[in-house]
Amino acid sequence: MRGNFMSSIEKLGGLKQRLTITVPAEEVDKAYKSRLLKVARTAKIPKFRPGKASPAVVEKLYGKAILQEVGSELIQSSLREAVEEHQLRVAGAPDIKMDKILRGEPFKYVVNFEVYPEITLESLAGETIERTQVEITEEDLDKMLEALRKQYAEWKEMDRPAKADDRVIIDFEGTLDGKPFERGSAKDFQLELGSKRMIAGFEEGIEGMKPGESKALDITFPADYPSEDLAGKAAVFNITLQKVMAPELPVLDEQFAERLGIKEGGLEALRQKVRTNMEKEVHHHMENKLKMAVLDKLIERNPIEVPESLIEAEIDHLQQMTRQQVAMQTHKPDEAKKMELPRDPYREQATKRVKLGLLLAEVVKQHKIKADPEQLRARVEEVAASYQDPEKVISWYYTNKQMLSEIESVVLEDQAVAQLMSELEVKDQAIPYEEAVKQIQQ
């Protein structure tokens, strides 16, 4: 309908705007007649051959429905043209309120919407961030190998008092003021002493007990205990120790290396593989930490207002991710889909993600960044490496445009971050491996 309508725009404050569009009566009638004739050519009406009923008959039967369809078509075409005419960058889905459409009268509707913010990027020049360097010593490597030995330990039943690092099988019943409380008891419960899996005083109280011995422990729940019914309360746990088991660690030799998939090179090859895995883990974490530091600087230097509609959409996305995680953990997808989740806890994260998305898109645009084919290939290979047939997965990605574009977005983001890093000063800071592990676990 190119240009056959009137439109006016009103700025409502912030990123909110309103379009008022009026389509002249003659355009409404023209569109109605055209639609009526089109329907008449294909309509199947009793007592008439297909397409042979007169427009008057068709109008009597379908006039109201045709008029509604015309309204939808006029909105679609005129709104698209109005957005182009006013050079609007509409964010999210617009809210359309329309008057009743009538033949012979102008058709008016109002569109409330948000626009994307105008962004003028500020350089990060003058900013400083710290890059963490982690050195893995031989002592760190020895500790990791010892941890691996413990993972592959065989547990032998012992006829002696329990001590730290033992695995015990117990029956216990907890009471408050002499009454059992929910989830306060268990039978044949397996516990490793020193794991700090239970509240303070529980595991320590078992140390020194002998198999078959029973004991009452007076323990107070911490004030910040997650269950409000138990927080700060004094409880009594009646415990019976069934079994004491101690770990028998495998010898650190070529046979142990073979158990871990090392077919050649023996212990030396195992040490190298373990060191490589340790380096990969800390490198991945520290790279992410560095990336987030750069992105935080980007947000600090470029405060922008973001469309509320995009924040709400991102909250929906984050909630969907939560439901998927719950479904995987519980193996109850139907229940997870129905989970009622509050929106406010997601708002801060959603707002930050939307800001970063807009700012990074501007970095890519301003610096004319294109996804580097070599980096893209490396990313695809990294993903494919975790599958049984990597080459097949790689081929699948390169024949699936949608999936490849998702990895391309990650590569573009990495390249944008690299561009930002070139603008600021990076200072290296060395920390011990144990400190790096603590940061990873936080």
UniProtKB/Swiss-Prot annotation:
Organismal lineage: Bacteria, Pseudomonadati, Pseudomonadota, Gammaproteobacteria, Legionellales
PROSITE patterns for this protein: FKBP_PPIASE (PS50059)
Family: Belongs to the FKBP-type PPIase family. Tig subfamily.
Catalytic reaction annotation: [protein]-peptidylproline (omega=180) = [protein]-peptidylproline (omega=0)
Xref: NCBIfam families: tig (TIGR00115)
Enzyme class (EC, first level): isomerase
First-listed, main subcellular location of the protein, grouped into a coarse class: cytoplasm
Subcellular location field: Cytoplasm
Keywords for the protein's UniProt record, in alphabetical order: Cell cycle, Cell division, Chaperone, Cytoplasm, Isomerase, Rotamase
Enzyme Commission numbers on file: 5.2.1.8
InterPro entries on file: PPIase_dom_sf (IPR046357), PPIase_FKBP_dom (IPR001179), Trig_fac (IPR005215), Trigger_fac_C (IPR008880), Trigger_fac_C_sf (IPR037041), Trigger_fac_ribosome-bd_bac (IPR008881), Trigger_fac_ribosome-bd_sf (IPR036611), Trigger_fact/SurA_dom_sf (IPR027304)
Name of the protein described by the UniProt record: Trigger factor
Function: Involved in protein export. Acts as a chaperone by maintaining the newly synthesized protein in an open conformation. Functions as a peptidyl-prolyl cis-trans isomerase.
HAMAP family registered for this protein in UniProt: Trigger_factor_Tig
Record GO terms (molecular function): peptidyl-prolyl cis-trans isomerase activity; protein folding chaperone; ribosome binding
Domain notes from UniProt: Consists of 3 domains; the N-terminus binds the ribosome, the middle domain has PPIase activity, while the C-terminus has intrinsic chaperone activity on its own.
